[in-house]
């Protein structure tokens, strides 16, 4: 079975490098499922969960907050603004960030404040989704 080479990098580190039979990334227009042989594509990433399905069906779950995905027929490169393994996320901090963003949304006085609050809320919700996905996967 053909496999994809997968690299997830930030400006600070290479978070993941390996092979996979399937990858799901959070594109700005929705989730993209990528199999070997995918047409070349460059797309922006939104905050969300990256799922890397290994050859043995184990799953590596990562959280990304923005960046770009460069997809080639046998390779997926994610250049993320922020990337963290889901198991390393702090659920209490993500819940607190979500609550703070919701309060900021309600109290925002300008379009800039509102947009910032929306972005912070999207990131917190995406972190919580990654945590939940990783939790379900462990069962």
From Swiss-Prot:
InterPro entries: ATP_F1_dsu/esu_C_sf, ATP_synth_F1_dsu/esu, ATP_synth_F1_dsu/esu_N, ATP_synth_F1_esu_C, ATPsynth_dsu/esu_N
Entry keyword annotation includes Ion transport: yes
Keywords: ATP synthesis, Cell inner membrane, Cell membrane, CF(1), Hydrogen ion transport, Ion transport, Membrane, Plasmid, Transport
Pfam family, one: ATP-synt_DE
Topology of the protein relative to the lipid bilayer: Peripheral membrane protein
Known partners and oligomeric status: F-type ATPases have 2 components, CF(1) - the catalytic core - and CF(0) - the membrane proton channel. CF(1) has five subunits: alpha(3), beta(3), gamma(1), delta(1), epsilon(1). CF(0) has three main subunits: a, b and c.
Family the entry assigns: Belongs to the ATPase epsilon chain family.
Protein name, entry field: ATP synthase epsilon chain 2
Species, as recorded: Ralstonia nicotianae (strain ATCC BAA-1114 / GMI1000)
Source lineage: Bacteria, Pseudomonadati, Pseudomonadota, Betaproteobacteria, Burkholderiales
Gene name for this UniProt entry: atpC2
């Amino acid at each position: 079975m053909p496999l994809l080479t997968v690299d997830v990098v930030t400006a600070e580190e290479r978070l993941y490098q390996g092979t996979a039979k399937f990858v799901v990334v959070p594109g700005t227009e929705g989730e993209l499922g990528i199999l070997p042989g995918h047409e070349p594509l460059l797309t922006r990433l939104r905050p969300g969960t990256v799922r890397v399905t290994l050859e043995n069906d184990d799953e590596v779950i990562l959280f990304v907050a923005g960046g770009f995905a460069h997809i080639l027929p046998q390779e997926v490169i994610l250049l993320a603004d922020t990337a963290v393994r889901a198991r390393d996320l702090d659920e209490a901090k993500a819940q607190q960030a979500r609550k703070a963003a919701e309060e900021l949304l309600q109290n925002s006085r300008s379009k800039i404040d509102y947009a910032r609050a929306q972005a912070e809320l999207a990131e917190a919700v995406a972190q919580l989704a990654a945590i939940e996905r990783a939790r379900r996967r462990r069962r």
